[in-house]
Regions:
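The first (N-terminal) embedded transmembrane alpha-helix
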Residues: 17-37, 109-113
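Membrane-embedded alpha-helical segments that form the functional core of polytopic membrane enzymes
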Residues: 28-32, 36-72, 129-143
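Cytosolic, membrane-interface loops and tails of multi-pass inner-membrane proteins
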Residues: 2-11, 70-98
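Hydrophobic alpha-helical transmembrane segments
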Residues: 1-6, 47-60, 76-84, 103-111, ...
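Cytosolic-side membrane-entry/anchor segment at the start of a transmembrane helix
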Residues: 1-27
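Short regulatory "switch" loops immediately downstream of catalytic or recognition motifs
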Residues: 35-39, 72-73, 115-124
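Intramembrane alpha-helical segments
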Residues: 89-144
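Active-site-proximal flexible loops/turns
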Residues: 24-26, 40, 75-78, 106
């Protein structure tokens, strides 16, 4: 598949590859933590919330894209036995709709984007000593 064809994939293909329904497993705990910080300490800043939310989404994208890349053989087997939303990945890679390198590269870009946001939150907004360590733990545990 040519590089121009990769860019012409539909928004639906990219959304399917990103698996947005499964982002709730990261977004809801982040929102709960935000609500707890507001409730217990009366701390809430909308700009920090949206930056943190963007970082969580990028970490989720990183893990899902890495899973698409590293699990293509297993996803192909899983889909041939039984197609499920919860097993076998998005189905984009086993169907051959993208070159195998695309989810790997997009995973790395998402990881770097989350890292940049983490640095901004840690050092620009001075959100505390746990911002980067928690983000790194989340990203690495999902990626590997």
């Amino acid at each position: 598949m040519k590089d121009k064809q990769i860019l012409k994939l539909t928004v639906g293909d990219w959304l399917t590859l990103s698996r947005p329904p499964f982002h709730t497993v990261g977004i809801l705990p982040f929102a709960l933590g935000t609500m707890l910080a507001w409730r217990l300490e009366q701390l809430f800043r909308l700009d920090i919330f949206f930056l943190g939310l963007a970082a969580v989404i990028l970490i989720m994208l990183c893990t899902y894209q890495a899973g698409e890349y590293f699990d293509i053989r297993e996803d192909t087997i899983s889909r041939s036995i039984y197609a499920s939303r919860f097993a076998g990945g998005s189905g984009i890679m086993p169907a051959g709709r993208l070159p195998a390198r695309v989810p790997l590269y997009s995973s790395i870009v998402a990881f770097c984007g989350a890292g940049v946001i983490g640095l901004i939150l840690q050092f620009g907004y001075q959100t505390g000593p746990y911002t980067l360590p928690l983000g790194i733990i989340g990203a690495l545990s999902g990626f590997f």
